[in-house]
């Protein structure tokens, strides 16, 4: 509901370009709204961003189980945003069953822009499309969370049930046609 089709199309175009430099990647669109709402209504606002990212990691791990991926890969860049500080990345990593690889972690903005221009993703990444990440963003994000504090917040939530609810609203997106195949249909479990 908060991810416009134009954003899915933009990400699909970028994924197609990236597939020229890697094995054939797949695009999964996960609806985090159930988790975001519960976090917004239940947890301290300053921890929202880290909690959202931990849910993304938990869901990505479930998708990785199905695709047999041995690691997760992100475009995180140290210090770029509140969730990408060393303390917060460590807390986010703790939610993962797999290594999280961050090839851009030490790049500065100019390096990242130069790389994007070289591989052909710069123009596409500049497209102005509303982003779903800002809908529930806190005004006071914590830049130095601890695992203990985050686990206290998560204790207020039914994390496994929320992950399942988000997965039930996840789909694999065909990069060319944008056709969506629901998670339950992919996994043979329509009642995820």
Feature locations, PLM:
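ATP-dependent adenylation/nucleotidyltransferase module used to activate substrates
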Residues: 1-118, 188-190
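Peripheral terminal appendages
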Residues: 25, 68, 85, 89-98, ...
């Amino acid at each position: 509901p908060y991810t416009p089709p134009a954003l899915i199309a933009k990400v699909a175009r970028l994924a197609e370009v990236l597939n020229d430099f890697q094995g054939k990647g797949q695009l999964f669109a996960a609806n985090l709204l159930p988790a975001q709402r519960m976090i917004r209504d239940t947890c301290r606002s300053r921890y929202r961003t880290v909690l959202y990212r931990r849910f993304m990691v938990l869901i990505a791990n479930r998708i990785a189980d199905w695709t047999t991926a041995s690691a997760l890969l992100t475009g995180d860049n140290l210090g770029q945003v509140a969730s990408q500080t060393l303390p917060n990345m460590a807390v986010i990593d703790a939610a993962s069953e797999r290594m999280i690889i961050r090839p851009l972690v030490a790049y500065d903005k100019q390096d990242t822009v130069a790389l994007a221009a070289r591989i052909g993703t710069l123009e596409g990444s500049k497209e102005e499309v509303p982003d779903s990440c800002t809908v529930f963003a806190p005004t006071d994000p914590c830049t130095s969370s601890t695992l203990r504090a985050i686990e206290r917040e998560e204790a207020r939530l039914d994390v496994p049930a929320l992950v399942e609810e988000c997965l039930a609203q996840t789909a694999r997106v065909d990069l060319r046609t944008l056709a969506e195949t629901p998670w339950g249909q992919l996994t043979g479990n329509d009642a995820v």
